[in-house]
Amino acid sequence: YNGATGSVKALQAAMLPDGTAMAVYSLDRSETGDTSDYEIAYCTVAADGTPGTAMLATCDSNLDENPQVVAANFGSVDDRFVIGWHSVRDGSSDIQLLAVDGGGTMSNSFPGSLSALTSSGNAAVGGDFRFASLSGDHRSLNDLTIVWNETVNDANGAVDHGILKAAKLRYATNTYTLSAPLELAELPDRTLADHF
């Protein structure tokens, strides 16, 4: 889905091991393209196809865009969806976070944003971020990796090329942390990563 028509502007999906699926999407509630009226919503579908919870995750006048979702294991039999989206609040860019179980219930113990996980209160993760796929033996919350693109300017100040970066979410003893950014790849001159 490319978000070109209708009020749904972005759509991503994930599935828990039991077959419960979730779709997350940004919704243009203005129907005029006013990005301050974009909201993030999600819905669940049981393994047998029964529709589950449909919920707005945001309802504000801030930019909320680029919803992402991944299924992660939070412990022995505790599988949940992790939702993330780019937001701009009071001029500050951040990645908002939400953990939701298969029944659609939001967690009240999961951090609300990446900036809440850093000592400085700032997380320099680009708005075009993605969650890396989790599968097999690497589905733990400690395997959750966020990937994004940063641009490098040339000597004249014009955008020249991109660098792909990643950071890993860590959980231990009731504390969530975000690793320092790691450079995955620097693209050649005059090359940008539109899709990764």
Where are the language model's segments positioned?
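Extracellular, repeat-based ectodomains that mediate carbohydrate processing or recognition
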Residues: 1-196
